[in-house]
Swiss-Prot record:
One of its GO terms (biological process) is 2,4,6-trinitrotoluene catabolic process. It comes from the Bacteria. Its EC number is 1.-.-.-. It is an enzyme of class 1 (oxidoreductase). It comes from Staphylococcus saprophyticus subsp. saprophyticus (strain ATCC 15305 / DSM 20229 / NCIMB 8711 / NCTC 7292 / S-41). Keywords: Flavoprotein, FMN, NAD, NADP, Oxidoreductase. This is Putative NAD(P)H nitroreductase SSP0379. Disulfide bonds: none annotated.
């Protein structure tokens, strides 16, 4: 095994779902910016980046979230950094956001845009993504989990702990974020939370199925 291979596997063995962090230990600005950059640079379907990362350091906001996030009780109190990942709504070829991405970010030529839009529409139709608003949002939420995984892995490579969190009242969190002006519900919806910091106690040994249990080779 090469040194790089060992480093990668060590990071995955290090990572665990940390329920409580050492509240006295804080992640450096440089390290946390690296974690955010791995989220920003993550792949997404058609490269549309249908996400937003809200870093919640405000204690009052954390306390309000704690009341409606049953799976984040220890993390909201102790995490060095707490991130809410939002999924973008209405990601269709004619939406203002997609038009912005293809024209201003990706800078496609005007001549190529109609073909790009058709390819996008055909893809969403074939996968039943654009059947309704909920299927569109579900697709966008899938993309946020790619960024989530990359952020947690990069944290582990920096010896920083993390915990992904789905344990929250979706409707209540959405209402709170909307009422407090944190999100525009017309354009974004909560997808997943993730906490970062340094473990308070050592975890139990990692338990996973073997490769033989989960991998099938077709040769």
């Amino acid at each position: 095994m090469t040194q790089m291979q060992q480093t990668i596997l060590d990071a995955f063995n290090f990572r665990h779902a940390t329920k409580r962090f050492d509240a006295n230990k804080k992640i450096s600005e440089s390290d946390f910016n690296t974690i955010l950059e791995t989220g920003r640079l993550s792949p997404s379907s058609l490269g549309l980046e249908p996400w937003r990362f809200v870093v919640i350091q405000n204690r009052e906001i954390r306390d309000k979230l704690k009341a409606i996030s049953w799976g984040a009780q220890g993390q909201l109190d102790t995490a060095s950094h707490f991130v809410l990942i939002l999924a973008r709504k209405n990601v269709t070829s004619q939406s203002d956001y997609v038009q912005h991405m293809i024209r201003n970010v990706k800078k496609y030529s005007e001549a190529s845009i109609p073909a790009t839009e058709k390819k996008f529409d055909d893809f969403q139709t074939n996968f039943h993504i654009n059947d309704n608003d909920q299927s569109l949002l579900d697709w966008a939420r899938k993309q946020t989990y790619i960024a989530l995984g990359n952020m947690m892995t990069s944290a582990a490579l920096l010896n920083i702990d993390s915990c992904p969190i789905e344990g929250f009242d979706l409707d209540a969190v959405t209402q709170f974020l909307t009422d407090d002006g944190i999100i525009d519900e017309a354009h974004f919806a909560p997808s997943v939370m993730v906490a970062f910091g340094y473990r308070e106690t050592e975890p139990k040994d990692k338990v996973r199925q073997t490769q033989d249990d989960i991998v099938e080779w077709l040769e």
